[in-house]
Amino acid sequence: MTPSQAAPQTVPGIARFQGHTALITGAARGIGAAIAHRLTGEGAQVVVADIDLGRAEATAAELKGAVARHCDVSDRASVEAAVAFAVEQFGRLDVLVNNAYSCTADAERFEDEDDEEWARDLDVTLTGAFRCSRAALPHLAASGRGAIVSIGSVNGEQDFNNHAYSAAKAGLVSLTRTLAGDAAPRGVRVNLVHPGTIRTPAWEGREGQLERLAPVYPLGRVGEPEDIAAAVAFLASADASWITGTTLRVDGGLLAVNTGFQRVADGA
C-alpha cells in the first residue's frame, strides 16, 4: 500500500478567511498550531490561545496576523478575558476552535482511576469547550457567519482505553449536537472533528509506536496535524455553510475498518 499524503499546511491563492477572526485554544503547538497556520494562511486574523504563553508567543511570531494570549480553559474568567481580547484586538470574532484538552488519567484498570485526574481531564477537555463556546457565542452570532469547531477523538466513539479522556471526547459529541440546535437560529454553526492518531509533540519519545500503528490505518499512515487543520478550515468556512451538528472523522479509515488498533498499540 502506498501511504496517502498529508494535507498541505497552506493552500496558495485561497483566502476563505479574509476579514475573519479566529480564536484557537491549545494553539501553541501540535494540532492547534497547525490550525493557526492554516487559518492565517487563508487570510484569518488569529488569537493563539494557550495556557503556555511563551510557546503561544513563539507560534504567533511565525504567523502573519496572529497574536498570542494566555488562556486557561478551566477558568471562566481566563476564558472570558481571552474572548474579550480577541474582539478588542480585531473588532470581531468569527471562528472558535476548541482544541485544548487534558489526558492525565491513565490507569489501566478502571477501578484505579484517580478522582482528581478524572475531574481534570473532563474539566479541561469537555467543560473547557463549554466555557469557551458560552463566552464566544454572542460574538459569533454578531458576526453573521460564526462557526465553532471542536476537536474530539476516535476515542469518543470506540474503546481505545484512556477512560477519562474517552469520556470527555464522547461528551463533545453531545455538546456539539445540543449547541448546534441552540446556535443555528443565531446563524452560528457548530461541528466536531474526530482525529485518529496524529503525529504531535505528545508522541515525542514514542515515534516507534507511531510507525507500528501506521499499517493499522487503511490509508497506510498515521495522521499529521495538517490533516486536522484542513478539516477544521473546511468546517469553519463558507464551504460548509449548510453543515452543523455533525462529527467529521479524520482517521485514515480506522473506524470504518477497525483493523486491530488496540492490539498493535499494546505491542501484541
Residue ranges and their predicted role:
Residues V149-G171, T176-P185, T197:
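Catalytic loop of short-chain dehydrogenase/reductase
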Residues R145, A184, R189, I243-G245:
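Short, small/polar-rich loop/turn modules that mediate ligand/substrate recognition or access, typified
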Residues T2-G13, A107, T244-A268:
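Short C-terminal tail/terminal secondary-structure segment
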Residues S133-R134, R177:
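A short, exposed helix-loop element centered on a Lys and neighboring polar residues
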Residues S133, R221-V250, L255-A256:
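C-terminal substrate-recognition "lid" of short-chain dehydrogenase/reductases
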Residues D106-F110, D114-A119, L213:
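Substrate-binding pocket helix/loop in short-chain dehydrogenase/reductase
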Residues P138, G181-D182, S241:
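Alpha-helical segment proximal to the catalytic Tyr-Lys
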